[in-house]
């Protein structure tokens, strides 16, 4: 008993198995995470260090250097790089690809905790694994013409941030920009010295007077009372009443030697949006989170908080990753629908049999659903690589379906068999070797992409696995399921076929004449192919190359740098000239700008920063044309800024894989 006979005898079981796989895949498509990129763990860790307002020289000696020396002892560290500025430092550690980054992350935290006691008091740190989740999935700006920046920051920090952090899948919500309210103590040095005191005495007195500590407990009448001492300042006047010195000659209070002023904390960054000083908040997702669901949850939560947002405060979304993902999903859906429609049309035109056309309508969705089931088992996600693989595989799936269906129906009509079962199974057996060769050749092309190293391999592994899986499943369905379905659908009536149809006659006639002339003068083939090979080679040598394809993502990023030594105020003045140009472009919907701070939250000098420009949806000029126009207008101004223009997706990868610098 050969395989074809065995398959026919177990046709119900096989069809049930394929149906279960397809239905399970369709169900898994609802649970599969949705993201822009595959979940890639780059062999890179970033450490953010904060030590108050120390000058950069002291920061490098007292904080950065000890931490670096401690981190060098971690096994697997390949390179180590640091950036130090006033009160802050960033350290980037690169490991080898394939390193266990969870273990490396824990080792980094352990080493910093070991060295933390010798660092200046109050030093804090944050260790971040670099992966696609370091880029926000959705971000908003808060601006107002009537509210101060301190109020806007408090709104973001204490109202919006805690509420948005409760949305399922959200890892954290960060706030940038604005002003932080503080009280400034201006000491009269002459008066202070006249009382025989120093600045340290003032600082120590303020620290000791503004505390909340537990002092013990009392058990009484069967109850336990926890005692605390709360001497925190409650009013503006409480600060001035702080006792600096007490003795026989009297008590000296802070108000006797200093003036207390209400002020704002010094800021070393500038953040704007749409031409106004702004506060930005970014939402980051957990690894493996569903980006589309998170974005929908954030929008719903903000809508529910609308009554808590003061009048005159404007919220604008300057980035929404879910919009690009939804567009990718729609493109993949369109590719499937168009592919199935064209395949059905071709089969109907040339074979003129609706039953054979039904094969394509069954095979393509079944293969894609079964592939989605495999993606779910492998804990992958819907992203531009897997969706691209599914869309690219549609044509190959249809090819397997068409050639098998055409071969079966041709054999049935040639034999003019009254009982088609034996003919169908025989035709399927005849076509097994060509089908195996065709599928294997294509799989061999894409399978090696899964073994590439570095960033390329990390991304193309998802594409390779998706295409290889879909082609293997397509082969199995074309080899097993289609013949079984054909034995049940095709009848003796389908063996009757009149090949005198007009389209068939025209096609056969043109093909015979063309091939007859070509075979009489085979040298023509050489003369036609050689120029094509030459043109292809020249195109290959001159075509531009890049990691990510150029696509309209609805926005772009401008990194800029002023001449070295430029102050924050001067850089801000230069950048506002670019903002003025941005506001004149009709295609710009909104934008955000950072100076002294990076898009990924990394440190920048006072003369560096970036723009994130979001364009309006709908009909408009191409994104490259808009960028060229803006670049030209900025150049006409004679600006001293150096700019680097980039796509959103490439910037995301650069932030995670290496710091992007203009």
Identify the role of each PLM range.
Residues 524, 529-633, 648:
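Juxtamembrane segments of multi-pass membrane proteins
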Residues 123, 394-408, 432-451, 458-498, ...:
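Transmembrane alpha-helices and their membrane-interface boundaries in multi-pass membrane transporters
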Residues 318, 325, 329, 405, ...:
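Helix-loop junctions and hydrophobic alpha-helical segments within the transmembrane domains
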Residues 1-15, 415-426, 455-461, 480-530, ...:
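Interfacial helix-loop-helix hairpins and adjacent transmembrane helices
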Residues 25-31, 36, 314, 341-410, ...:
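Hydrophobic transmembrane alpha-helices and their membrane-interface caps
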Residues 1-341, 349-350, 355-357, 382, ...:
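Membrane-proximal extracytoplasmic
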Residues 35-38, 321, 372-389, 450-467, ...:
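Short helix-loop junctions at transmembrane helix boundaries
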Residues 1-34, 429-431, 498-548, 628, ...:
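Signature of alpha-helical transmembrane segments and their immediate interfacial
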